[in-house]
Amino acid sequence: EGDIIFSFLPKTPEQFFSFLGILKIKAIAGTLFSSFGEDALLDRLGDSKAKCLITRKSSMKKINKIRDRLPELKYIILIDIPRHESPDILSYSQLTQNASDLFAVPQTRPETPSVLHYTSGSTGKPKGVLHLHRSVLHQSSTSKEILNLTDKDIFWCTADQGWVTGTSYGIIG
């Protein structure tokens, strides 16, 4: 609870599942643009003091180049390996194989931190913006109002989940 967990993934089902799972365990979810290089990853993972990163094996080349400068990063979960590789390189499949089919969400208070977004850095160093659980409710509500969505609609947001629009409307909405 309260740990910062980032995902560095393209539009895969695991991106959506992990984001919602992070919220479910009352951790703070962050997403990283899927084309980021080492410097952008280091800026955001280092500044946030992220404890865990969910990514793919093909991204490990970038991560390994900066890992020694991320002392708070304790775990990396890979979505495309069948078994844990070490105590700190874990398999998404192995971690989720016994997950419950029930979607039981614990009660949270509106002021509980939920999502950490970073600005693009167009005016300087990227800045972290912490959203609260009340904002998750508002994003869900506004996406229905703005996009005129109903329970019968299927919506696909083309924005990368590494940016606020992709998360707010592509995952939460």
Give residue spans per PLM region.
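Structural core segment of the AMP-binding/adenylate-forming
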Residues: 1, 24-94
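Conserved AMP-binding/adenylate-forming
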Residues: 1-36, 160
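Conserved AMP-binding loop of ANL adenylate-forming enzymes
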Residues: 3-7, 147-173
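Conserved S/T- and glycine-rich ATP-binding loop of Class I adenylate-forming
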Residues: 5, 22, 53, 113, ...
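Short hydrophobic alpha-helices that are characteristic scaffold elements of the AMP-binding
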Residues: 20-25, 47, 163, 172
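Conserved pre-ATP/AMP-binding loop-to-beta segment of ANL
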Residues: 78, 96-118, 125, 148-154
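Conserved structural elements of the adenylate-forming
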Residues: 97, 129-150, 158-159, 168
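Conserved AMP-binding A3 loop
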Residues: 114-138
